[in-house]
């Protein structure tokens, strides 16, 4: 331990700001004036027993400093822990402005104990115990840091979280922590403490916010390409952990990593919690990325007698996007999807994107995309879509996202039946015993409350080698508003699922109406369902054996089209009627696992012999 450092001008400024007080002695003092230590104010539940109370001269060592963002401050850890594994020895000290302490300082902190809910209490997140309105006394500098707690398979339980207390609205906040039993209890018992991971596999690629995800339990549900598959509400992947850096990116660029890469060496820093991923290792020291060599996939070309039907969410595409985005998306269609016969697109925006001036037409968006496909060596697709009523289909304000069909007229024809518009519902009729759409393209039940502020399904009738095929393109309601997996209420409240369940009922009912007219009708339902193959909405689509979800034809390790918070998961689906058998099906991984993406979704294709 060193003698106190010369504080000089830094302390003068900090004194003026009320963030720091002059040392009272020349040696590090680990005794609290009022007897309160960090583990006392943290307590053995998720809520501090001292919340709202003032504390005086809480001692500890500074283990991390955050000088950027809206949550500036530092982490304080007591080098003399108690014997209770449920009580954290670390705490965040919120200073509001850039703190002037340094890592390794021995300090005492006086202030108010608070519980901060990232994103606001209504968001459902757990709280972070903090000391606010602090007065900080630097006692000495250059002290050794408390040894990090190593997070690995042996330390982190497979079980994720206990069920909440029914008497408290299923809240877990007041439950005694059981860090040996549940991963979220372990992480909470380490909140604010110095932790370490070593040689960890990346399961969520570096994002635009300089974050990535690793797993400290690589044996849990591995994907075929190095990720971690989310396959059940009851079986969470407890080893997922978000990594951020305490070093501003202007000083040290954040590493670029793809799924399957390894963050080699040690990554160490305080364990934080935020609304963008829950428990987060805020690294003082970052490991080095070792590439796994992940490459974008390419599917095979359809055979002459195979109808290739694909779906691709192109993430808010509009003409103002850089040409490079159009070119990359086009390469996805031509090179990686092998130019399918029909492509259902989601998130096509209107001709001026997010400019909210009443524009709803998207012909410029679609034609620019088709031109890019031709330039990439693909066919000059034709397109069909229906412009929505302005501002009624959700998505980015002003963008008026909708689904659209691209089709290769050299291989497949579209059966046009006029009259389809934003508000006219399509219905099923019989044409000499064959199911036919009243309008094509048409929208399913656009006036139903299930589709309020959401994209209406787009139905179209195609013909391939003389055989009619009805295709329904979907983009169900988003998961916005759902509580996070780390929510303080368990089981997690998935409020958005109600809307998607209603939408599934609508689509399933429409398909069954088709089959009531023609039992062996050829029907493809596809798109961004925004829900999992095991979800209530996903299962409801298949009710009555009206459809088969092709995701279930894949091995569990291959079932994903999207990566979120380190979970590789199914959001995009292709479902087919029983008359189409079991098509050759491929989710083509070109985006979701990569730091450099053309879209946040992977496309997929089914090759069908009608």
Which functions belong to the PLM regions below?
Residues 24, 131, 202, 414-415, ...:
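A broad structural signal for short, well-ordered beta-strand segments within beta-sheet-rich domains
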Residues 29-308, 312, 316-339, 425-429, ...:
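Extended non-catalytic accessory segments flanking core domains
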Residues 1-29:
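Secretory targeting and sorting signals
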Residues 3, 34-40, 364-368, 548-549:
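Secondary-structure junction/capping motif
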Residues 7, 12-14, 33, 255, ...:
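Short, functionally important structural connectors and interaction interfaces within domains
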Residues 276, 280-610:
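Divalent cation-coordinating acidic motifs and surrounding scaffolds
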